[in-house]
């Protein structure tokens, strides 16, 4: 069954495996998330659930969202995200989803907004090769030619210096090292996108699901 949860990145630490090896992990406060809305093929054309996460003062909720929460008779939340699922029959509006939907050893896909790094050149932003650093070189970190003579303009999509980071990034196939249901914590091996305190989305691994379907 497909599953997903919203969480907050708390930071990174390390734990010891039974064989004594150190494993770098990211600590995520996953849930509790409440099911705010359920969408079905009959009513909306596709199956999905809308999850709410995080506390928010009622004075900060605008009128359209306030009406949305009141319509479904759930408490207002800071974040709302939609998860497409094959089967939504087992979930109902008001159900609470916690970190224990995932187990140790599972593979997950994590999505977040990468940390903004400001204005960056082509070498840092696009991994361009740099020029000679020795005496007599006219360029060191310049991007070089931007195109041919014929068009006499820069084509769209050309890799140029600009703002780096602040984009939606998904890291595939990360392993769940530990789950603490009481504290709603999930420890994920390796780094996940985003700054401390940022919102991240955890879903079951797409590649693992495809491999399992192929094997069957």
Curated annotation (Swiss-Prot):
Protein family per UniProt: Belongs to the universal ribosomal protein uL3 family.
**Quaternary context:** Part of the 50S ribosomal subunit. Forms a cluster with proteins L14 and L19.
**Which of UniProt's keywords are assigned here?**
Ribonucleoprotein, Ribosomal protein, RNA-binding, rRNA-binding
What is the name of this protein?
Large ribosomal subunit protein uL3
Please state the gene responsible for encoding this protein. rplC
Q: Is RNA-binding included in the keywords of this UniProt record? A: yes
Per the record, the GO terms for biological process are: translation
Q: Identify one Gene Ontology CC term for this UniProt entry.
A: cytosolic large ribosomal subunit
Instruction: Cite the GO molecular-function annotations of the record.
Output: rRNA binding; structural constituent of ribosome
